Design a protein with these regions (language model features):
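Membrane-embedded catalytic cores of phosphoryl/pyrophosphoryl-handling enzymes
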Residues: 101-232
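N-terminal transmembrane-helix/juxtamembrane module of multi-pass inner/ER membrane proteins
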Residues: 1-42, 77-107, 228-232
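Alpha-helical transmembrane spans of integral membrane proteins, capturing the lipid-embedded, hydrophobic core
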Residues: 40, 63-71, 75, 163, ...
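Hydrophobic core of alpha-helical transmembrane segments in multi-pass integral membrane proteins
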Residues: 41-50, 67-68, 213-227
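Membrane-water interface at transmembrane helix exits
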Residues: 47-51, 73, 77-86, 129, ...
Length: 232
């Protein structure tokens, strides 16, 4: 019990160290970053990446498993763990709620363990990392997932521990759904893609030009968020 209480206190301190900044600019950045709408262009490019580079026989399977990844992460968080563990969000924790900075008065629901945002983000990121197999792409999507997750702590609606458990859970689910995909791909011998130069294609046969397009749109979105935040 003493060790558990120590972990809880450490988690609270870590959370308060990440939460808020007193800056309207960074508050705006955090708010925009967690908006679904700002990521629509990147989502469209991700679908384009799949359609252009995955064998037509497996495109629907990939899209289906991506949806399953999100569904499993979301439901395990919201329908199983949050009602089961009843861990209050920082914004509702009586021990620290008066010390937590919020943005636009947003406090989230009552319970926050574990973070569905972190699980979804890392679940999708892990699936894409294993699917595309490109170093800079992998680094880019993992950074995206990390930022998408830790910003929830900045906003005060998740403890750092919620984020860590959500991230690990998401990566596990993303790995499992990709494994399911790989089993189907191995059975479908006719769908094996043989690509040419490694300068043009990743190890999994994705065109590097398409991968770099995705990365460019990702960092372009970061730039748009920063620019828009200057005027909010």
């Amino acid at each position: 019990m003493i060790e558990a209480q120590g972990l809880i206190e450490t988690d609270r301190l870590a959370t308060l160290s990440v939460n808020g900044s007193g800056s309207l600019f960074w508050d705006s950045v955090a708010s925009l970053y967690t908006s679904v709408y700002v990521w629509i262009p990147l989502a469209l490019v991700a679908v384009f990446l799949i359609i252009r580079n995955v064998n037509p026989r497996r495109i629907l399977l990939v899209l289906f498993l991506l949806a399953v990844t999100v569904l499993l992460c979301d439901q395990l968080s919201s329908s199983v763990c949050k009602p089961l563990f009843h861990r209050l969000r920082p914004t509702h924790d009586p021990n620290i709620l008066n010390m937590v900075d919020t943005v636009n008065g947003y406090r989230g629901g009552l319970y926050g363990f574990f973070s569905g945002h972190a699980a979804n983000s890392f679940g999708l990121a892990m699936f894409f990392v294993l699917l595309v197999k490109h170093r800079w792409f992998s680094l880019s999507v993992l950074i995206w997932a990390f930022l998408n997750s830790i910003i929830r702590t900045y906003l005060g609606v998740h403890f750092v521990g919620d984020i860590v458990v959500g991230a690990v859970t998401g990566m596990l689910i993303g790995s499992i759904t990709y494994w399911i995909y790989s089993m189907f791909a191995r059975k479908d011998k006719k769908s094996i893609d043989v690509r040419g130069s490694s300068l043009l294609y990743t190890r999994s046969g994705f065109m590097r030009s398409d991968v770099y397009l995705f990365i460019s749109v990702l960092f372009g979105t970061y730039s748009v968020i920063l620019i828009l935040s200057c005027f909010n």
